[in-house]
Amino acid sequence: MKSPLITMSALVGKPTDKDIFNYLTDLKQNGIDQVMIYPRSGCLIEYLSEEWFCAIRDFIKSAEALDMSVWLYDDFNWPSGDACGKVTKNEDFRLKSIKIEGEDIGKVSSKSKHNSDIFGEKFFPDLMNPKAVDYFISLTHEEYYKRFGNYFGTIIKGIFTDEPSIGYCSQNGYLPYYDEMEIDYKDAYGKDFFDDLLSHSEDFCRNAMKLASAKFKEAYIDKLSSWCKSHGILMTGHLMCDNEPFYSVRYNGDFLKNLSAFDLPGIDEIATCLEDRTLMALLGGIEYARKEKGAMAELFALGPCDMSYAKKKCMLYLSACHKIDHYFLAISHMDISGNMHVCDYFSDFAVAQPDFGGMRLLSEDAKIARELAKKDYSPDLYIRFPTDISLKNASRDFDLTVLFSLLNELSYRGIQWKYICGEMPTDAPILELDDSLQLILNGNAESIESIISMLDKKAITDTYGECVKGIFRRRFNDGTAVILNLYAPEGGYVIDGEIVYLYEHSVLLNKCDLPTKKEALHCSFKVNYCNPNIVRLMTLNDSKGAFACADDELNVRFATRKDTEIKIDGACPELDLNYNPLPKGICEHYNITKEQSIKSEKIIIECQNDLKYMPSAMVIGDFSANIISGDTCGVNLAKRKGAYNIGEKFADFGKIELLARVRVPQGAVGIELLGTKLYTMLYLEGNLSGEKITAPYIFNIEKELWGKDIELKIVQFSSIGPIFGDVDYWDKNAKHSQWRGTPSTSETHFGFDEINWIY
């Protein structure tokens, strides 16, 4: 069975059939055998043109040859329903809103616009209009089926719809509106639409939103689902603003009902902020909507691009604990030219990442997570999703902090809960919010504290007996459990009366006894650098240049983005057309200068249009770099270290080997590395002992090596993150930003705190 990891593969530039085959081959070799073809900014092929469909054919044919699966995406960028502006060219197909408060009450606007930080002003499609939706399907779904119908249900598994919504034009004081809504209102409620509107009837907002919700479901969701079913594939994707219950209703109507109508319902968990106040609310929603085909989550899109594998794994298992078994990885870039358009966040599941080989291990973890998602658990409490109160207040901002606080407290106290809507289960108490946002349990008003006290479970505590936030436990009906360290500090915690050690972002499926008998390994390592170091030269805001200098005389080159001009100390550099060490997907967009010497005197590199994740200029060479951020940014370079001592940490980029001669003690069964987060491989006398992407980093030793002097080689890989330099400084100081995504940590460090023999 194929891995449940599915890359959202950004189709950018003008890839050839060979480019596509090579790209998919790279994914396949690294544990990924499902891709979603993702039309995105940076694509130079006209969307839905014959050239476009030729590229899609190349994807499908290559996937077939490699035994991979393909998912389609139903628009260009997001949100879905417009076919890259083709639908809204017809004014009758544009989303409408009606003013329900203040001046011009009752005015219907068919020319509403929504300002997008990324895409500017645009119209949005009316997904309550069946004719508009039929036109959208004819432009996209039908065109794909016309050309590739014989692959539907085999190579092609489904079509992804991204953030469709009826709320894009409904700012405060407005509601979604469709033609002849007033007729449906009269039929449904026996009252006049405009009489209730003008008299400010307390039921008007709720009633109107119910109609809009039903129309959205009938005209868009049900229609797409029916089309997909009849063509042998799945309709998947997610709705807008699904992380907050109120806004999920404001933008989509009856959120849980509409999401449940997807064949493979999904959520958008792109921030990977494991301490986010809305995370548990988001996961509870998809768990409710899950179908027999499963559920999906779009994950990791905001990065950072140097996110640890431990955090990725933890997010996969947290998703699985809420019955999610398809993991769409955002984004996999064929090349990074899309960063010219979507500039301020970057995540990459592709071979441009030096540590991409670790995806093979994450893929195996994902398969375990998928099986975990099949398990059920019994709730200690049911929580009625706040659909009604959200519908009543859909024309204004509304704060449901009390709900988020409750869900988080329950989750970290080990109290299991599930959403319900209209159901009346009897196997656990039911809690709901009244119109004043009071928590009502068994007919009585309660505080969060009193609810916790009544439902108290054995919470996970620290060694002082204090309840700990950030540790999540799921107890399944089959008697098994999962413990996840979402954001608590690494250390020992009391679980069921025993002290258990949890690493940062630990995933604990079974009780794991850590080694107690160990001995420190003392040696010095030779350092072998497998690639040149690469780091950006940042020119932020009004700055036109950056500087570089060196403690010792060094030879360096500069990478210059092909669409920019740079000068080095006032002169245009000479290019070397036969050398380019930049990673695949990046090298295509940069020229490399000929080698030159750099000394202690600063040289000035003038360049323009520097972008956060597509630098105008980078320096390349055999050096270590001290990044200096300020009004004028730069780098101070020094020789790379040739020897490494245990306990040191050092910044660099790419792949590094640490080599030493050691004598294996009698009785040693393993080697333990402490204090790293990197993808790490360990070799003993030239043979691979193992590879790890998460703690514990423990590698086995065969007894045949006892008492022998052997070569110990430790290989570590960084992410792509180090080449982008101090992006935290960029985020804090950039004057112009489209949208600040999750910042990079800028803290990739090679090395370890300790290395121990295990007995």
Which sequence ranges carry the predicted segments?
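Extracellular beta-strand-rich recognition modules
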Residues: 601-607, 669, 710-716
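Catalytic and substrate-binding clefts that recognize carbohydrates or anionic sugar/phosphate headgroups
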Residues: 82-150
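Carbohydrate-binding surfaces of carbohydrate-active enzymes
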Residues: 3-22, 33-40, 45-85, 90-102, ...
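Glycine/proline-rich low-complexity spacer/linker segments in large multi-domain proteins
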Residues: 75-85, 608-633, 717-759
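Short beta-strand segments within Ig-like beta-sandwich modules, predominantly Fibronectin type-III
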Residues: 689-693
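C-terminal substrate/ligand-recognition segments
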Residues: 221, 226, 655-660, 671-680
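Short beta-strand elements bearing conserved aromatic residues within extracellular beta-rich modules
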Residues: 564-566, 680-682
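Short, surface-exposed tryptophan/glycine-enriched loops
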Residues: 583-602, 697-709
